[in-house]
């Protein structure tokens, strides 16, 4: 078993001479884009176009066009609000159940409880970590009104299975696409961009996302014009026009400054994704070179492109992940765990959710062993070589 005490930080003193490695390098990205970002900020300041306005409208249309979504995009305050807006627009509320994967960020299930419905946790696929369609079916009940499909880490869940299943049972399919914006599903039955394959889709522009703002932001997307209009109304206090409120909504508007900054990044979208894919390919090659036999690399879904929001490996069973992380940190190599605790084990849901009868053993196993390596647009081959070499050294000593 790996023992952190057998690897003192002094062994890695030479690492301080290397270029720093960041888990996410927003500083490097923004330095490259700084002139364009500054110009966008100056324009918004000069126009005082802070709430909604032309920059938001422009960004919504450009996102729709650039990613060939073929629908309607409504900006909002953040990715969590986007999920809540989608559920509210669909009329999900008390007495309803919403199936969610047990392995995700808390907002996926949090918004279900917020609208008064019951989250029902289903298990995940052991290879892709996406919602397992068979477990989703076992979680279904007469009260099931929606399923929240999370496209995790940069690729799509099994939409060839999930979309027809949801349609067969009259279940709304909401895509939580915070991590996989730009991914495309091309199955024999279902084809299209992530976020536009179900009833509604959502995304997040949190700064570390592949398309990140310099603050919070999110969006809801759908092919249904009426649903889009309701989302826009709900996000603006339920108002159809100023001081005329058709329903009780709340305040969740994408602001003009963030929209202008997102427009800058959208101009560089293809390059940003190409850099992530190149970094993932380098990790693949490096892991092949050192002949890891017990480390599981990220699986690629058969019919999905991958935008690599994260590059997550599975450590061997029994590995002391905490010790591995600490020793890597001492060597100047950051890592992260997405996610350490399945949602069904979170105290927040102790009384407000239920879990599929067969449990979620895969989600619990993955949560114990998953490890995210640095992944961003500024990664170099030298950085990645250090990451893999040090990881191999540590695991080889166990």
Feature map (PLM): residue ranges:
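Conserved active-site segment immediately N-terminal to the catalytic lysine
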Residues: 175-212, 242-246
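Structural detector of well-ordered beta-strand residues that form the stable sheet scaffold
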Residues: 74, 99, 120, 173-174, ...
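Phosphate-binding glycine-rich loop
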Residues: 48-97, 111-115, 121-123, 188
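PLP-dependent aminotransferase-like
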Residues: 88-180, 184
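PLP-dependent aminotransferase class I/II
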Residues: 3, 13, 27, 56-62, ...
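Hydrophobic/aromatic ligand-binding patch that stacks against planar heteroaromatic rings
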Residues: 111-112, 165, 193, 210, ...
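N-terminal "arm"/small-domain region of PLP-dependent enzymes with the aminotransferase-like
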Residues: 1-49, 54, 331
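Active-site PLP attachment segment
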Residues: 196-232, 239, 256-259
């Amino acid at each position: 078993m790996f023992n952190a005490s057998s690897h003192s930080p002094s062994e890695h003193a030479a690492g301080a001479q290397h270029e720093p490695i960041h888990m996410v390098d927003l500083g490097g990205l923004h330095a490259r884009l700084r002139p364009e970002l500054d110009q966008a900020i100056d324009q918004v300041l000069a126009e005082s176009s802070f709430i909604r306005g032309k920059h938001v409208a422009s960004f919504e249309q450009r996102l729709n066009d650039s990613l060939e979504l073929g629908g309607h995009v409504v900006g909002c305050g953040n990715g969590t609000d986007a999920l809540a807006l989608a559920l509210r627009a669909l009329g999900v509320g008390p007495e309803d159940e919403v199936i969610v994967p047990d392995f995700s960020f808390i907002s996926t299930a949090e918004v279900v409880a917020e609208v008064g419905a019951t989250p029902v946790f289903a298990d995940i696929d052991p290879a892709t970590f996406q919602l397992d369609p068979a477990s989703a079916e076992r979680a279904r009940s007469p009260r099931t009104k929606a399923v929240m499909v999370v496209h995790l880490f940069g690729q799509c869940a099994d939409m060839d299975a999930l979309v027809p299943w949801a349609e067969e049972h009259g279940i709304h399919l909401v895509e939580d696409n915070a991590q996989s914006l730009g991914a495309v599903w091309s199955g024999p039955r279902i084809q299209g961009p992530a976020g536009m394959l179900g009833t509604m889709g959502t995304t997040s522009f949190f700064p570390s996302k592949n398309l990140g703002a310099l603050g919070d932001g999110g969006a809801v997307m759908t092919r249904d014009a009426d649903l889009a209009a309701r989302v826009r109304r709900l996000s603006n206090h339920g108002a159809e026009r100023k001081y005329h409120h058709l329903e009780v909504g709340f305040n969740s508007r994408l602001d003009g400054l963030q929209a202008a900054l997102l427009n800058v990044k959208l101009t560089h979208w293809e390059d940003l994704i190409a850099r992530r894919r190149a970094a993932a390919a380098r990790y693949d090659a490096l892991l092949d070179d050192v002949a890891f036999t017990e480390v599981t690399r990220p699986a690629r879904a058969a019919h999905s492109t991958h935008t690599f929001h994260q590059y997550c490996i599975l450590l061997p069973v029994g590995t002391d992940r905490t010790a591995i992380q600490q020793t890597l940190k001492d060597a100047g190599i950051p890592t992260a765990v997405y996610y350490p605790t399945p949602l069904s084990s979170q105290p927040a849901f102790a009384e407000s959710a239920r879990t599929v009868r067969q449990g979620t053993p895969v989600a619990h196993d993955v949560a114990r062993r998953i490890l995210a390596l640095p992944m961003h647009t500024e990664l170099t081959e030298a950085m990645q070589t250090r990451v893999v070499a040090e990881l191999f050294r540590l695991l080889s000593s166990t």
